[in-house]
A protein has these predicted regions:
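Flavin-dependent oxidoreductase catalytic cores
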Residues: 1-217
Length: 217
């Protein structure tokens, strides 16, 4: 099944998720060769790009064979995120993604990744500025919520759609769950019902059968 994200048309709706330490260039090329419609890069700190961190420059490299490719940025400063994306607009990236789902303590302590789900107003500001700063499609990846007292994936998805985001990706666990327990695909369905933009399901997709079942459910 084909999928369109903004003006980027994908061959199919099978997407390689962004995974730090996993989705490097050789892995992405391999996944494209095996039929993935879109591959996502390892998350990159917008601040690290700003400060010209050497390791970060390596993470930004792309091979034409892997396109279309999505560059995932993370950060909590709306201006820095928007300015960095704008500075990379002429680069070999087809989509800009913003990470609002990373559960790692170091990231969360900095108010980045899934910590942003506790601050919908800041989410709105980041996404609004990012969408205005670039012509390429913007997507956002987030979780079911921060914890059981903050299940707000639907609210975040609606904010994203209103800000002009082209698609959202939803992981069916809260930040407090990390990767334990079972991913709640029902929340993905709720988000799908709440917005008109494409919704990408994430979590517990280990086999082709899982992927098929996720789409059906």
């Amino acid at each position: 099944m084909k999928l369109k994200i903004g003006n980027v048309e994908l061959e199919n709706n099978v997407i390689l998720a962004p995974m730090a330490g996993v989705t490097d260039m050789p892995y992405r090329i391999l996944c494209r060769e095996q039929g993935a419609g879109l591959v996502c890069m390892e998350m990159v700190s917008a601040k690290a790009i700003l400060y010209k961190n050497k390791n970060t420059q390596e993470l930004l490299k792309v091979d034409e064979r892997e396109r279309p490719v999505s560059l995932q940025l993370f950060g909590s400063d709306p201006d820095i995120v928007a300015d960095i994306a704008a500075s990379l607009e002429d680069g070999p990236y087809d989509i800009f993604d913003i990470n609002m789902g990373c559960p790692v303590p170091k990231i969360v302590k900095n108010g980045e990744g899934s910590a942003l789900m506790r601050n919908p107003k800041l989410v709105e500001e980041i996404l609004t500025k990012l969408v205005k700063a670039v012509k390429k499609p913007v997507t956002v990846k987030f979780r079911k919520g921060f914890d059981d007292t903050c299940i707000n994936a639907v609210e975040i998805a609606k904010i994203a759609e209103s800000a002009g985001v082209a698609a959202v990706a939803v992981h069916g666990r809260t930040r407090e769950q990390y990767y334990s327990g079972k991913a709640d695909w029902n929340i993905i369905r709720e988000v799908k019902k709440a917005v008109k933009i494409p919704v990408i399901g994430n979590g517990d997709v280990f086999t082709p059968q899982d992927a098929k079942r996720l789409v059906e459910e």
